[in-house]
């Protein structure tokens, strides 16, 4: 998908609350985001699916904050990275509490 098309779809989601436009973005980026998580989770497909879902939920919730300072994919991957970082941090906290 071209960056121009991504911007158009983002605008439709923000201005018109067009969920079908967001569905198109999900279709385009679902596989790459899932592969990103598969690499980070050593192939754990269930966890990768959960993290990808969290990424798209956060992207939809915060799509109005997309400022087109970078490509939509860069913005989405930053969200994905943050979702993974939050997951790792929560796991460390759970492990730390279990050993207390």
Explain the meaning of each model-derived region:
Residues 1-32:
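N-terminal module of bacterial RNA polymerase sigma factors
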Residues 14-24, 35-54:
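Short, charged helix-capping/linker segments at alpha-helix termini
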Residues 15, 42-43, 56-71, 91-92:
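Sigma70-family region 2
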Residues 50-57, 70-82:
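Structural recognition of an alpha-helix C-terminal capping motif at a helix-to-coil junction
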Residues 65-67, 81-97:
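Arg/Lys-rich amphipathic alpha helix in sigma70-family domain 2
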């Amino acid at each position: 998908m071209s960056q121009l098309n991504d911007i158009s779809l983002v605008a439709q989601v923000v201005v018109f609350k067009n969920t079908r436009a967001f569905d198109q973005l999900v279709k385009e980026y679902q596989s790459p985001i899932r592969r990103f998580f598969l690499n980070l989770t050593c192939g754990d497909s269930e966890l990768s699916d959960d993290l990808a879902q969290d990424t798209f939920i956060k992207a939809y919730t915060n799509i109005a904050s997309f400022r087109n300072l970078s490509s939509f994919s860069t913005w989405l991957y930053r969200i994905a990275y943050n979702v993974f970082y939050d997951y790792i941090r929560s796991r460390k906290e759970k492990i730390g509490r279990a050993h207390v």
